Swiss-Prot record:
Annotated organism of origin: Mus musculus
SMART domains from the UniProt entry: IG (SM00409), IGv (SM00406)
Protein name: Ig kappa chain V-III region TEPC 124
Gene Ontology CC entries for this record: immunoglobulin complex
PANTHER family, per database record: IMMUNOGLOBULIN LIGHT CHAIN
UniProt region (Framework-3), positions on chain: 61-92
Domain of life (superkingdom): Eukaryota
One Pfam assignment: V-set
Amino acid sequence: DIVLTQSPASLAVSLGQRATISCRASZSVNWYGNSFMZWYZZKPGZPPKLLIYRASNLZSGIPARFSGSGSRTBFTLTIBPVZABDVATYFCZZSBZAPWTFGSGTKLEIKR
């Protein structure tokens, strides 16, 4: 199985600043020119929400403050600028090789 190493485990960012979350795969998740990496946002009591698919594509309805980048094994989720509503846990997920696997999550908090 592909192992995803996500960092940092937690992150405190001031409102209006940039949050950067990294995800490294144990092997390439590229296939036919696509990077099969997704990013999700999860809030307590709510199902995970897809933010980014295939590494850099913004899901419909997701604000452009969210962006994804990377290829092969190294990927980044950026939130810029961070808003109060972004407090959540963020997960990367690979959809290249079954069983699909998730990173361990990054908890985003607002720095006061």
